[in-house]
Amino acid sequence: MILLHAIYTLWVIILLPLLNAEKFVPKVTEAPIETSFNLVSFDDSNTSIRLDGWGVVWISFDAGENWETVKEIEERIFRFTVDPFHGQERGFAFICESPKFYITDDRGESWRALTIPSSEEYLDGDCFITTHPRNKELLIANCYSYMIDADVLYDPSEIYLSNDGNPFLKLNLPWKRKKTTI
């Protein structure tokens, strides 16, 4: 009797929710695209985003059958990433050599621009954004710039922390610059 009760409980807890879950079925379609530089998809979603050879961001909400440009993104983008910790809804679009980037929290339905207040020497570098695994609003920006000073290559970084992009605060960390002689 206890065994039957345990099996019934297991069925109710594990199998019943799986039977009622919405089915995600990946679909592969062929679409004529001239050039594509970067193609990513959100986790468990039919939404895909790609960059063309000119840095224009295209989005498809139907597994690549139809594509449209993202109107909110005005600049040329050089890299797009899906957040590794919040990949079902969040993505980042980065502008080359700029502290400005775009973020979406709804699989590309809407976009907002954020700017990291990096110092002038970092304007020719790039910033990489990381989020906290449990706190989605916590953004960490690592901005770097390669500078040559008297035949020595410096690879300094500036680290910024933000609560959902408002505002980014610079962290003053006690580390030394990494030097490489040319």
UniProtKB/Swiss-Prot annotation:
InterPro entries: Sortilin_N (IPR031778), WD40/YVTN_repeat-like_dom_sf (IPR015943). Keywords: Repeat. GO terms for cellular component: fungal-type vacuole; membrane. Coiled coil: none annotated. Transmembrane segments: none annotated. BNR repeats lie at residues 58-69, 102-113. Pfam families: Sortilin-Vps10. This is Uncharacterized protein YCR101C. The lineage of its organism: Eukaryota, Fungi, Dikarya, Ascomycota, Saccharomycotina.
